[in-house]
Amino acid sequence: GDVWNAYEVSAITNKGLPVVGMLKIYYSADSKLHVESKSIKLYLNSFNMTKMGDTAAECIAILKDRVKKDLSEKLQTVVEVQMFTSDHTPTYAFKGYAQLDLLINLDELEFTSYHSDATQLKSTPIPEDMAGEVIKIQSNLLRSNCRVTNQPDWGDVFIHIKPSAGFYPDLESIARYIVSHRQVSHFHEEICEMVYTHLAEAYKPQELMVACLYLRRGGLDINPIRA
């Protein structure tokens, strides 16, 4: 049979939370029809801002069923679909960074801004046991768009931050801020510098590092780091 691995699959929940993952598509070699690669790419990209389900799990289930139904009808054969999120393959270039979705319940948050909204960044009182501690978090919810082609660019963002007194980062607000780049059109380096600058201005940290590891495109992956 034929197996397709789609690495840029995403939709959003009814609360606006992006869900991202790799979609595996399989159909029999007996099929009399074949799918054209550019058309399936455009088809899958059409879900990027489509709301599906109240939670990430519901969104994935609905998206899988929708793709299976649509492709089975188009190819006139049975199509099997699986979706794998980053939870299944936590292999990252940076060690010791906590996944943001394991620190807070993203399903409970509302996401409404998708145009790099630095006003999303909020502070909370520093917990006594965290005074002077370095915060190291990562998220796979970074999506921006190429300023030339407007094609979506997908990445993981890693943040190392040592807070100053009175400026402990609110993790829920950081999640909202990362998601707010979803409809921004800039180069990878510009996005990384924007994130770094906004975090520096919002929290006045003693230490700060931002790395944006973007998915490979055209044989190249760009990984800007600012510190």
Residue ranges and their predicted role:
Residues 1-227:
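N-terminal intrinsically disordered, cationic/polar leader segments
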